[in-house]
Amino acid sequence: MTLTDISQPAPEAATHTLARLGIPESYVDAHGNVQTPPVMTLAAVAEAVSSGPVVEHALVCAPGQPCADLVGDLTDLDGQPVPGPEGIGPAAGYYHLHTPEGGRRLVISAPERLPQPVRGWGWAVQLYAARSRSSWGIGDFADLATITRSAAEAGATSVLISPVHAAAPVPAQQSSPYSPASRQWLQLLHIAIADVPGADRVDLRDLERAGRGLNGERRIYRDTVWTLKRAALERIWAATRDDLPAEHDAWVAAQGRDLELFATWCVLAETYGTAVWREWPVQHQHPDGATEFAAQHADRVAFYAWAQWVADVQLGTACRAGATVVADIAVGFDSSSADAWTHQGGVCFDFEVGCPPDRHNLDGQKWGLPPLNPVALVAADFRPFITMVQSALRHAGALRIDHVMQLWRLFWVPQGAGAGQGAYVHYPTEAMLAILRLEAGRTGAWVVGEDMGTVAEGVRETMARYGMLGYRAALRLPVDQFPEAVMGASSTHDQATIAGTLTGSDMDDLRTVGKSANFEQLEGVRRELAEVAGVDPDGPIGAEEIHKAVLAQYRRLAACRARVVLASLDDAAAVAERPNMPGTVLQWPNWCLSLPRPVEDILAEPLARELAQVLGARD
């Protein structure tokens, strides 16, 4: 579809299907105004969604509770009969209901509420940015262990990290952790090479020197980091592959076909020099055509499976080291990703997910992530969603779901259209929420839904009913009005830091990159922050003034009702730059700036210690 197509009238037949397909003809934006998507957008979205198979929606029930629709023969997913009274929810789990009419439905039996966190505080950290002296140019899982251990010693209950989803093993390495190659597998850049089993059996001194040398500047060079770490992993693999521990063999076997496909995709990307799988030879553009290739490259496929095991072990160690790790789940995956390759039949590549203009982003956003077809997701028994959640909860004690509206609806923007020219598509909310309750209940994990921006009516009420915390971030006085059932923060990765706000450098950055913003309002926020901190907004702003402002802001957060409050390591380190500037590509070093000093130093500095005291005094 081209931009000129969007203004054309929609075929009448297409508009008739909108309600049935869960595509609203209008929506209420963040300012309370009713917006109507372009008619050609609605028609194109309807055509894409209706291309999926016709299936029955999943049936959600609760263990031991009456369920009138639970009539028929119940089996487990392997087809074995499940005994029990008809019309009563079975034990928590997934089942198939074979109805008297000959149909089959997925049954999700889940607890009625999610586990809950205690009142407390924690650190928010962009893991890639949290380098230590021993890092190889990027924060790693050993650094995460340092952070969680330090956090627990300081009295923190949690550590929220940026997504650690997998990236493609070829240049250019994707900078954004929110645009992954797979949400099921892990980012190999976060492997701490010194902690890899067998690292002591090979000489890595040359690679280590080069890796640590990357810590000399704040810019993170992922391609260079990957070149060095891949070389180190290859040396260790060559020395250990013939006598790998039984734990490795058991783990790889347990991951089964999913891991085999991901590792095969990695080798295909290496072989053809690109992760854009639609540019590969036709026979390899689909997993079914890659079986012979995988057999021919069995050692390399095994290498990538082993590397995932290494990453998984290290993440598990970090998650057990101290405070509860809150894993972050991205909205989707890159169109050239392993997940897109694996699940391509259910991916709508002619669209990208985004959000309409709101008070945080006046131009709206396009995230470059193709949406899953909700009809195809139901037909697949939600397997892509289930495996993603299970992977995230393998070690983490809590989840943050970025853009929690992904469980209700997503804003589909046609390729080539502006961010404001999209339309919403609804998803099977009750089933996806039940999956979350089931998987979180199995591990005792609590869940946070990032519900900022444009949020549909009734969403927050549903979150509260099931025990999902919301997310609030604000530098302004309304932090005092945060509700209790939320995770509260001063800002998100897309917003200004305290130092950037107080100095005014964030406004300068916005102007430099050409971003639309209400600069009068932003100046008001700056002056309000200065007043609360007892700082002259028109005087010189240096380290002392920033120190005062950081403590003043977090005193406000400490006193708010939010169940869990977060202090960012960016604020503890007085970082002025945003981690990410939405709507920019080359104009800003998105996701590429490390913290200005080693993370172990930042955690030991007076500001971090004082922040811990302020937040630790929460009643």
Where would I find each of the regions flagged by the language model?
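Basic helix-extension-helix modules of the SAP/HeH family
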Residues: 2-49
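A generic structural signal for well-ordered alpha-helical segments
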Residues: 18, 151, 318-322, 440, ...
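Short, polar loop/linker segments at the starts of domains and inter-domain junctions
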Residues: 33-34, 134-142, 280-283, 503-507
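Extracellular ectodomain segments of secreted/surface proteins
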Residues: 41-82
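Extended acidic/polar, glycine-enriched regions
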Residues: 72-120, 130, 136-148, 153-154, ...
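Beta-sheet entry/capping signal
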Residues: 94, 104-106, 120-122, 148-150, ...
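Alpha-amylase-like alpha-glycosidases and glucanotransferases acting on alpha-linked glucans and related
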Residues: 170-312, 316, 332-566, 570-572, ...
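Structured C-terminal cap/extension of enzyme domains
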Residues: 574-619
